[in-house]
A protein has these predicted regions:
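Mobile gating loops/cap/lid regions near enzyme active sites that modulate substrate access
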Residues: 149, 166, 469-583
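Substrate-access "cap/lid" subdomains that shape
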Residues: 174, 277, 311, 320-430, ...
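Alpha/beta-hydrolase fold nucleophile elbow
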Residues: 282-295
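Non-catalytic accessory segments of hydrolases
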Residues: 2-251, 255-259, 521-530, 541-545
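Short glycine-enriched nucleophile-adjacent loop
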Residues: 298-310
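Alpha/beta-hydrolase active-site loop
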Residues: 257-280, 337-341
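Alpha/beta-hydrolase-fold catalytic nucleophile elbow
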Residues: 237, 292, 307, 318-321, ...
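Active-site loop->helix "elbow" adjoining a glycine-rich segment at hydrolase catalytic centers
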Residues: 208, 263-267, 295-298
Length: 583
């Protein structure tokens, strides 16, 4: 009897713990987690009284599953600062009057969820963004509006990742809900200093996410720190994936501009137009706008620097961890013929022939569809938004920015390598040859691999240099012929993700204080320095300032290492870049 009791209680405890952990990571309501514990106690009493273990186990699984279902996290809009925040006064823009909210210490005004275009739904799906409608009454800009339609990240995996890397643990504990997403997503957010101002510089930030995922309100690029330093910070959502970058000759025929495949990018330009037309009402200077972005947002900045539609609409550019200026960009860009071919594969997958057939489908079905070419997540030379590849535009001197701050992280590609096949000493040379058929022999001389450990280590270096560093190198070299270029190399390690992809964001935008348990005094000092560099650049086109280590322009041939030490160095991957030039 004792063995039977021990076995049942052990099984009950184990299953309860597994369900509790799953529901916690899945962000189920706290009431659901409590109810599971109560149910486990009742099951224990039932077994103790009846000794009917089979029935008890069946009842346990049925009840646990039912509780898990009825306590699923609800979708809701994310508050701009906090629930019940104090409201600002009214501001009048072209569409009407609106109010925002103050942050907790009252030093920053936040205006969230301002429509910059009509909802791209129904017949407006896959069309250039249209002007927003007039407001009915006063718009309450106090919550972030839905993020763009995209494939939902598995909540359990997402929360587990946050906890594993000690990122956003507080968010996982507090936020027992799911942020809303919708095809109706064309909204922007503005952070500004409290009270009236005039002619403040503006940072126009484009979020990343491979052009398929992401949202405008992520904590790492929250704009309050910039607003406290007299810079207005704007970010926004735009169409993603197939809804934003699907190319179809029939859609080009529908367009008065003959465009297709660039709807998400045209959203970005539309948001920029709205900011230029209205930012003076918030105290901003429409003639001193810096466009900024990370990852796919950085690729978008790169495209905006060469788009004829963006000419004269911004002044400076900040680019972090992605560039499409190489002759053969490894991601985020493809030629129009390839884009149209990829678009056809989407129609084949969904059983549609014409745009009208696709417009009848739900946004969820389209966003969740993979083609044989993968997801639709690349910009293209549509002849309207981009008339040439960025490389061709820079070669011709046809770029828009007056100064450029650009760089990447030491381990930018490490996460992406987890999706690659395993590298060892036996397949190392073949993998290098496949990626760099002209220069692989020189690469193998620079980075030979006699052991599996050497193969893994060296392949990471080569992958990071080729996938992330090289595009920034080409961009820097071409741009520096005509303008000041400031290039960085981020190497800081910490308790979180260190110098992996997105690792620089909380430093550059002044947000390490949102997760103080991840950072020490050296991180705080680096954050203060990087934020000062970025803000100075947004104000003047030069990151240097009083008390900061000198950041030499790239024409010196060096980059600024941002790590445990801040110093000018030669790019450690420069020899690889010269080999990549041959491809």
């Amino acid at each position: 009897m004792r063995k039977e009791k021990f076995a049942f209680y052990s099984f009950l405890i184990l299953v309860t713990i597994v369900f509790e952990l799953y529901m916690f990571l899945n962000r189920n309501a706290w009431s659901g987690l409590i109810l599971v514990l109560v149910t486990a106690f009742i099951i224990r009493l039932y077994w103790k009284k009846t000794r009917k273990g089979g029935r008890a186990v069946i009842a346990m699984f049925i009840l646990f599953a039912l509780i898990s279902f009825i306590s699923l996290p609800k979708e809701k809009l994310v508050p701009a600062t906090y629930e019940g925040a104090n409201r600002t006064g009214k501001i009048k823009v072209k569409e009407g009057r609106l109010t925002g909210v103050y942050n907790k210490d009252g030093s920053v005004e936040v205006y969230a969820g301002i429509p910059y275009a009509k909802a791209p739904v129904g017949d407006l799906r896959w069309k250039e963004p249209k002007n927003p409608e007039k407001y009915k009454g006063v718009l309450r800009a106090d919550h972030f509006q839905p993020m763009a339609m995209q494939k939902r990240t598995n909540r359990v995996v997402s929360s587990a990742t946050d906890i594993f890397f000690y990122r956003n643990v507080t968010r996982t504990i507090k936020n027992r809900y799911v942020p809303k997403m919708s095809e109706d997503c064309l909204y922007l957010n503005i952070c500004k200093p409290r009270g009236p101002q005039k002619k403040l510089p503006v940072v126009f930030y484009i979020h990343g996410g491979s052009l398929t995922t992401g949202q405008a309100w992520w904590e790492d690029y929250n704009g309050e720190s910039y607003a406290k330093n007299d810079v207005i910070f704007v970010n926004f959502s735009y169409r993603l994936g197939a809804l934003g970058f699907y190319a179809d000759e029939n859609l080009a025929s529908e367009s008065p501009n003959g465009t297709t495949g660039m709807y998400g990018f045209l959203d970005q330009l539309k948001a920029l137009d709205w900011v230029r037309a209205n930012i003076e009402k918030f105290g901003g200077d429409p003639d001193n706008i810096t466009i900024a972005g990370e990852s796919a947002g950085s690729s978008s900045v790169n495209a905006m620097c060469t788009s004829p539609l963006a000419k004269g609409k911004f002044k400076y550019a900040i680019s972090e961890s992605s560039s499409i200026t190489a002759k053969k960009p490894p991601h985020s860009y493809m030629d129009i013929k390839t884009a149209i071919k990829q678009g056809k594969s989407l129609r084949d997958e969904l059983g549609a022939k014409k745009p009208k057939d696709l417009r009848k489908l739900s946004a969820e079905d389209i966003a969740n569809t993979n083609t044989k070419y993968g997801t639709l997540n690349a910009m293209t030379n549509d002849g309207y938004a981009l008339t040439k590849s960025p490389y061709e535009s820079y070669m011709a001197g046809e770029n828009n920015e007056k100064a450029l701050l650009t760089g990447y992280n030491k381990e930018d590609g490490d996460f992406f390598l987890l999706l690659e096949s395993k590298t060892d000493k036996d397949n190392y040379a073949d993998k290098i040859k496949k990626s760099y058929p002209k220069g692989y022999e020189e690469i193998l001389k620079l980075y030979p691999a006699k052991t599996d450990e050497e193969a893994v280590k060296n392949f990471k270096i080569i992958y990071n240099a080729g996938t992330f560093g090289y595009g920034h190198d080409v961009w820097s070299r071409l741009a520096s012929e005509r303008e000041p270029v400031y290039r960085y190399y981020f190497t800081k390690e910490n308790k979180s993700i260190g110098s992996n992809h997105t690792g620089e964001l909380p430093y550059a935008y002044g947000n390490i204080g949102k997760a103080p348990y991840l950072y020490d005094g050296s991180d705080k000092k680096l954050c203060e320095t990087m934020t000062s560099y970025w803000i100075n650049f947004a104000k003047t086109g030069n990151p240097n300032g009083k008390g900061l280590p000198e950041w030499e322009p790239y024409n010196s041939g060096k980059v600024l290492e941002l790590g445990s030490k801040i110093k000018m160095i030669s790019d450690p991957n420069d020899k690889l870049y010269r080999i990549f030039d041959q491809e």
